[in-house]
Curated annotation (Swiss-Prot):
It comes from Aspergillus terreus. Esterase; part of the gene cluster that mediates the biosynthesis of lovastatin (also known as mevinolin, mevacor or monacolin K), a hypolipidemic inhibitor of (3S)-hydroxymethylglutaryl-coenzyme A (HMG-CoA) reductase (HMGR). The first step in the biosynthesis of lovastatin is the production of dihydromonacolin L acid by the lovastatin nonaketide synthase lovB and the trans-acting enoyl reductase lovC via condensation of one acetyl-CoA unit and 8 malonyl-CoA units. Dihydromonacolin L acid is released from lovB by the thioesterase lovG. Esterase that catalyzes the release of covalently bound dihydromonacolin L from LovB during lovastatin biosynthesis. The gene is lovG. Its EC number is 3.1.2.31. Keywords: Hydrolase. This is Dihydromonacolin L-[lovastatin nonaketide synthase] thioesterase. Belongs to the LovG family. It catalyses: dihydromonacolin L-[lovastatin nonaketide synthase] + H2O = holo-[lovastatin nonaketide synthase] + dihydromonacolin L carboxylate + H(+). GO terms for cellular component: cytoplasm; nucleus. The keyword Hydrolase applies. Gene3D superfamilies: alpha/beta hydrolase (3.40.50.1820). PANTHER family: ESTERASE DBAE-RELATED, ESTERASE OVCA2. Lovastatin acts as a hypolipidemic agent that works as inhibitor of (3S)-hydroxymethylglutaryl-coenzyme A (HMG-CoA) reductase (HMGR) which reduces HMG-CoA to mevalonate and is the key step in cholesterol biosynthesis. Lovastatin, simvastatin and related compounds are widely used to treat hypercholesteremia and reduce the risk of cardiovascular disease. Furthermore, statins such as lovastatin were found to be anticancer agents. One of its GO terms (molecular function) is thiolester hydrolase activity.
Length: 256
């Protein structure tokens, strides 16, 4: 499936990779980000990726977005209770494929508009986190350098942390002295990030755990807002998000 860019004429100097939530779609994510897109339209193009697995509608999607299906998710649900399903590495390979194809399509058609950051919502925010971490670890040579990220109501599973720990420990099997110090530092992402957390979000506890475990306190900003599992909708909250993200982009040198 080819990438889906902002429908308006491409004219911004840089682009952001947009990774929607579970049971969602690029069309829905475009609507969810409409206020942010409007504020940043002169600065960024928004490049949307479609998740690999067809699924039912996710939380909060129906009935509002009943006409914007079909819906997709990043991780295929499994009823296997014997733990014989695909490993995290195998599932990430399925996640990487549509993202890589989207990036290649964008770079081919818009070689002078680099992708410099990412926006992820819910399950897409967890995917974004894993992409950022894998890139920091020297993997994913096909992924453009991610300099900034906005994570909206991240969904979290401890399985992701365990995967990261296992990958790090592979490099420290013979280094006992570093197991309690250096290797833990390798689990922390060190790029400017803004984390939006709805106070009434069912995923709030996991969102807090994700930023505490895997993002540098010096680089990560957390903004709580009055709301549930959604992009903020109160005007003052929206303005705060826009202002903070702009400043973050300046810090990351993705915005002048």
């Amino acid at each position: 499936m080819r990438y889906q860019a902002s429908p308006a004429l491409v004219k911004a100097p840089r682009a952001l990779l947009c990774i929607h939530g579970a049971g969602c779609s690029p069309a829905i994510f475009r609507v969810q980000l409409s206020k942010l897109r409007a504020a940043l339209r002169e600065n960024f193009e928004f490049v949307y990726v479609t998740a690999p697995f067809p699924s039912s509608a996710g939380p909060g999607i129906l009935p509002v977005f009943a006409d914007l299906g079909p819906y997709y998710s990043w991780f295929e649900s499994s009823s296997d209770n014997n733990h014989n399903g695909p490993s995290v590495s195998e599932r990430l390979a399925a996640v990487h494929d549509p993202i890589r194809r989207t990036i290649v399509d964008w770079q081919t058609q818009h070689p002078h508009i680099p992708i410099v950051g990412a926006i992820g919502f819910s399950e897409g925010a967890l995917v974004t986190t894993l992409l950022l971490w894998q890139q920091q670890m020297g993997h994913l040579p096909w992924l453009p350098r991610m300099s900034v990220a906005l994570l909206i109501c991240p969904w979290y599973q401890d399985e992701a942390s365990q995967y990261m720990r296992n990958e790090v420990m592979k490099n420290h099997d013979d280094d006992n002295d570093s197991k309690d110090t250096e290797w833990q530092e390798e689990l922390v992402i060190r790029i400017p990030t803004l984390h939006l957390q709805g106070r009434d979000d069912f995923a709030l506890a996991g969102s807090k755990m994700l930023v505490a475990r895997h993002f540098s306190p010096r680089e990560a900003q957390v903004l709580e807002f009055a709301g549930q599992h959604q992009f903020p909708n109160r005007p003052r909250d929206v303005l705060e998000v826009i202002n903070r993200f702009r400043k973050l982009c300046v810090t990351a040198q993705t915005l002048e």
